[in-house]
């Protein structure tokens, strides 16, 4: 499949009490990839929530990825996103198979992106591009990096970090394939607004 469009990432605290309803609202608006991101140690809840997301993704034809847990991804038969502290990519590829989508966090480093590509990544993720609630201390990236990555890395490029409808367009214009969004999507007050935002993010790729 072509990896291009909105990359929605969940936040269990942000979505407390409205987890599946707001995720489904996003899927209604159109989501290319959905990442389940939960940093707690509650394995039973994480499995339950991931299974719920998998059912929704199957209904809407969206690819599900698990953040930082290749074993859970393998159990569900879905993809995984790995950060630089989550272990090497090669064992995850061996575990999940050739067809699985595996993403790699590359911060603001072309060297990390090249390494990820050589290890079998499906896409590389750069960021943060703007002030981020989720990762305030992450190294900053800029659109110049995107242009260099587009020329050097032959993989889809995801961008993350404080992305909203007000600042996303230049990232797409400079080569981003995937807009990875958490608060800019799920911070909406209503499910209807989540759907509207999802559609608006996707519209940036249509021009």
Swiss-Prot record:
Segments traversing the membrane: none
Record text on cofactor binding: Binds 1 Mg(2+) ion per subunit.
Keyword Ribonucleoprotein belongs to the record: no
Cofactor requirements of the protein: Mg(2+)
Residues annotated to bind 2-[(2R,5Z)-2-carboxy-4-methylthiazol-5(2H)-ylidene]ethyl phosphate: 132-134, 162
Phylogenetic placement of the source organism: Bacteria, Pseudomonadati, Pseudomonadota, Gammaproteobacteria, Pseudomonadales
Domain of life: Bacteria
Organism: Pseudomonas putida (strain ATCC 47054 / DSM 6125 / CFBP 8728 / NCIMB 11950 / KT2440)
A GO CC term attached to the entry: cytoplasm
Family: Belongs to the thiamine-phosphate synthase family.
MF terms in GO: magnesium ion binding; thiamine-phosphate diphosphorylase activity
InterPro entries to which the protein is assigned, alphabetical: Aldolase_TIM, ThiamineP_synth_sf, ThiamineP_synth_TenI, TMP_synthase
Entry binding sites for Mg(2+): 68, 86
Enzyme class: transferase
Record-listed 4-amino-2-methyl-5-(diphosphooxymethyl)pyrimidine binding positions: 35-39, 67, 105, 135
HAMAP family: TMP_synthase
EC number, UniProt record: 2.5.1.3
Protein name, entry field: Thiamine-phosphate synthase
Matching CDD domains: TMP_TenI (cd00564)
